[in-house]
A protein has these predicted regions:
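Structured, active/binding-site neighborhoods that engage oxygen-rich ligands
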Residues: 1-135
Length: 135
């Protein structure tokens, strides 16, 4: 297995595991999180199984779009926008307001390069790690 493939797999697995471990404490103060979840070595959301958020789902969509586009920027943009549109149809739980607005704009025909919205959220940063590994 190549080093790049190992790095890509590690990024995807690390994103999912970190997301599953941290999801139950999202939005909680450090003190409240420590009181509710003293053992951070396992997932707490949905029992022992854990659950990932839209951050992991979108990282997987980025991976799919990278593969479909062979890394060509315009094709990547179209492939990711297409995937986001159909992801929204699944009725994702806990979707952020900015993600919802941007994806609805895609459905309304706004081009991907103009569908973004201003937000203080960290979603794009969470989903961009794979791009750093690939490029």
């Amino acid at each position: 297995m190549s080093d790049k493939r190992r790095a890509i797999e590690g990024c995807l697995i690390g994103t999912a595991v970190g997301d599953a471990l941290g999801l139950a404490g999202e939005g909680l103060s450090r003190r409240r999180q420590a009181r509710l979840f003293p053992d951070l070595s396992r997932p707490h959301f949905l029992g022992r199984q854990g659950m990932v958020s839209d951050d992991t789902e979108h990282t997987c969509l980025v991976a799919q779009a990278l593969i479909a586009s062979a890394g060509e920027l315009e094709a990547l943009t179209r492939a990711l926008a297409w995937r986001l549109r159909f992801w929204l149809l699944g009725g994702p739980a806990g979707i952020g307001w900015a993600t919802l607005r941007a994806t609805v704009k895609l459905w309304l025909g706004v081009p991907p390069d103009r569908s973004g919205v201003w937000s203080a959220g960290n979603g794009p940063a969470m989903r961009s790690a794979l791009l750093g590994v690939c490029y």
